[in-house]
């Protein structure tokens, strides 16, 4: 559900919270690194290079006064300073990778001149240009209509498979998670209450997961009233 802490966890992995925020985990292991105890200088070598994060809505993530191609190139230049010609070539290459037609024309466009689907593809290009090992996708299709959503998800799935990337996919859409993910962590009030293979979601054991699934509308088996999730205080402590 909204407010369960999904995006909070994704941002915590990249130390994107303000300094006053408290992370309760004793460690956050990524390959050979404990992200919890890295300095800001060390995190700059991880953030955007080894781990990238795709945000929810490109309208709020892209700079409105800089053409989108330069924003993609900037992600490359952050980790390879001074190589502007190579950065532009890489940005054009990434626009082709994310299946944007006429990449040289789109490179010069500003965020208000592109569609929502193009914007999310550009965000994906920006996050992949540094060849990361892990992508955190924070509800990357929530702002898109259904047909464009499926196109972007198909593209993301192809890129993850072909490049051998790890993917943390954050979503509140159980049916989407069921079809797109391998394993699911179900969160409630900032806690993981169940870890389950996506193919086994119909056999979930935790009452919260069961309640979420049971409250979904079903076109094949219509019900006049959807059940209301009955919450239990024990979910906060078990």
Give residue spans per PLM region.
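A short, proline-enriched helix->beta-strand linker immediately N-terminal to the Walker B motif
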Residues: 129-133
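Short catalytic/signature loops enriched in Gly
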Residues: 101-105, 196-238
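A short, surface-exposed alpha-helical micro-motif characterized by mixed small hydrophobic
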Residues: 177-179
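Conserved ABC ATPase "signature" region
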Residues: 34, 86-105, 213-214
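ABC ATPase NBD coupling module
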Residues: 35-52, 78, 200-204
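Hydrophobic anchor residue at the start of the ABC signature
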Residues: 72, 124, 135, 148, ...
